[in-house]
Amino acid sequence: MQEAQVDVKVQSTKTLVMSSQYDKEIAAVAHYMHNYHINDRTTYQKARISLLDSLGCAIETVSKSAEVRSLLGPAVPGSKIPNGFRLPGTSYVLSPVEGAFDMGILIRYLDHNDALGGAEWGHPSDNLGAILSVMDWISRSSAAGIFTHNGPPMTMHTLLTATIKAYEIQGCYQLLNAFNIYGIDHVVLVKLASTAAVSWLLGLTEEQTMAAISHVWMDGQPTRVYRSGEDTIPRKGWAAGDACMRAVHIAFLVKHGQPGSPGALTNPRSGFYVKTFGDKGFQFARPFGEWAIRNVYLKTMPVEGHGISSVEAALIQRERLQERGLGLKDISGIDIRTTAAANLIINKTGRLHNAADRDHCIQYVIALAFIKGSPPEPEDYADDSPFATSQEIDALRDKTIIRPDEQLTRDYLDIEKKSAGAGMTIYLEDGTTMEEVLIEYPSGHMSNPKTKKLVEGKFERNMRLKFDDGEIMRIKDALNEDSMRVHEFLDLFVRKGQPGSPRL
């Protein structure tokens, strides 16, 4: 498998001849987007699975979340966009900018889409909000003869290629660059990867793509405050959509002639490094290639990714309790050893204020698993859920201790192993201890042999919320039609007369 030999560590002369003035990190992303060729069939098959999973998540969200439905649709009710993006699961027709926001929300909001860890964490499928909206608009507009397109063909093969490359850009940045240390939210990498992908899709030159990427680093970046403690709010569910929307807007601005700033990262007075990230700049463990799409974690339950191992461990321990004729009242303590990332992101004590707070609390999802005997569902986090005010939930949360474990953290950060481990030990009221259950590769992890079947089942369950079996089969078949136009593919997801509620 070919690996891109141009990255931020090693630059070829050819890369810099055209625009040596652009920061090397900016040039590397643009070069990869425009010049790297993917020939491996397995890589494309992984992309098909990720695309199906993401579209299933979108249908689940539009079906289950009234809160999300209130955010969908044109900003100005009744506005019309000729040949606009057809938002899956609805009858909305949107501009590619607004469509990127809405599609980004649908994929991300219920925290059921894929994930990838590292020094930074994130969700590479977030980028599909930008990719799908732009490709659909280009495909329809060029077919109607109202837009002259000079970029790659708007086919399923191109969609998969853009997906693979967006995943790779975001994933390689996540491995060693901890934006969270600086209070920056990980959706900055969605903006980066989506800007690169959309620039290529729109037919921008490599030079113009560098200009667009420079605008990503000139932007003020969103902070993690909306994911933090009592300040956690639903914005964490639409932050990726916001990043997609901005990426599309930037690419269009550059398409219409706006220049970039070559030193957006390294300008000694005002660059991103000196003002935000530190003099050492970005670090990279590997060159851009096809690594991320092959290692992404496909969630089989709507739980923040770092907590899924703990949920699975809880279900096993619950079964052991029942085998011994014991119940939850017999538990005196629950000890969880897990990764430093899990401890930082989802270890929450005290009052939980809303659904966004609950779905990012490891103690809450563990308690849910013990009480229900099954993984959490999106409705379990809602304010009107009986679990939201359950004293039994609170009692189990109070008994749960979370400890970051050095070995599990090393394995999580190891680029070759990439486990997502958690170990759970149960202490009983009679003074005895139940043996630890250790889950290193939970369902959804590419190293778990059950993942493929579980993800396919997840897709079909989600799709049945709005589609019949015949329609689902047609969608799955279409995914293998490399020459199919993207707008023809997305037409399969339209639900007439189901727009939801327009945002005001």
Swiss-Prot record:
| Record carries keyword Lyase | yes
Which InterPro entries does this chain map to? Answer: MmgE/PrpD_sf, MmgE/PrpD_sf_1, MmgE/PrpD_sf_2, MmgE_PrpD, MmgE_PrpD_C, MmgE_PrpD_N
Superkingdom per UniProt: Eukaryota
| Family the UniProt entry places it in | Belongs to the PrpD family.
Reaction equations catalysed: (4E,11E)-2-hydroxytrideca-4,11-dien-1,2,3-tricarboxylate + 2 H(+) = [4-(deca-1,8-diyl)-2,5-dioxo-2,5-dihydro-3-furanyl]acetate + 2 H2O
Q: In which pathway does it act?
A: Secondary metabolite biosynthesis
Q: Name one GO molecular function term.
A: lyase activity
- Its recorded name reads Alkylcitrate dehydratase phiI
Origin organism is Fungal sp. (strain ATCC 74256)
